[in-house]
C-alpha cells in the first residue's frame, strides 16, 4: 500500500477499479499476514509462521526466500499458486484506523494500476452517490476479514501467553551453491506443546486453536518447495535446515506484511 486514502463520494465519484487476475503488485512481497481460518487452505501450499512481538504477533504465510521476491507471482503477473491469501485478495482496499473516533475507515491504494476514472472495471459509487453493489461487497469482505483477523490475534496471544513460540531461522543451499537464510519469524515449540497440561490442551482443542497449531507445524515442510520455486526451473534437491535464533537476532517488529526477511550470502 503506497498511497492509501479514504474512500468517499467526494473523492471517488468517478472512480472505478479493475482487478482481474493481475497480481504484479505483490511481486516484491515475500510474506503476507494470514487469518487462522485460512490455515487449512494456505497450509497445504505455504509455510505458516508467526511474526511480530508481544501483542503484535500475527500468523504469516511465507511466499519466497529471496528478499523482495514473491515466488508465486509469475512473469506475466498471474498467481502461480492454488490458494490466494485474503490479504492479497482484498487489495487495493484496506481498513485504516481513525484513532480519534475509534473507527475503521475504508481506504484504497490510489497507486494501484487498476484504479481509474475511465470506467474500467467496477464503479465505487453510482451517479447519485450511493454505494454500488461492488463497493458493498468489498466492505462485507473486509469486515469479515477484520473479524477473522481479530480472532487470529486472540489465538496468537494464547501462544504467547503459554510461551509456545520460539525464534527460528531457515537456511537454504540454492542451485549454484549460494547460501540463503530466512529470519525474523517464530514457530511453535513442539516439546513445549507436548508438555501442556490436559486442561489447557482441552481448551485449545475446543476453540480449534490446537488444530491451527498442528496445521502450522505441518506446513513447515513447504519451506523446501518454496526454496525450489525461488531457485527457478531446474532447482533440485534444495537442502533445508532449521536453527533456533537468539531473541533479538533478526527478530521481527510490528505487524506488517513483510516480517520474514530473506538474506543471501554467496559461498
Predicted regions: what they are:
Residues 36-41, 84-86, 160-164:
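Short linear motifs in intrinsically disordered
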Residues 57, 67-68, 188, 199:
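Residue-level signal for pocket-adjacent positions within structured domains
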Residues 42-45, 89-90, 164-168:
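A short, compositionally biased
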Residues 1-63:
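Short, extreme N-terminal leader segments that mark the start of a protein/domain
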Residues 24-28, 66-77, 148-154:
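Short, basic/low-complexity N-terminal boundary segments at the transition from targeting/disordered tails
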Residues 51, 58-125:
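Aromatic- and glycine-enriched beta-alpha-beta binding-site module
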Residues 95-267:
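A contiguous, surface-oriented mixed alpha/beta subdomain in the mid-to-C-terminal portion of proteins
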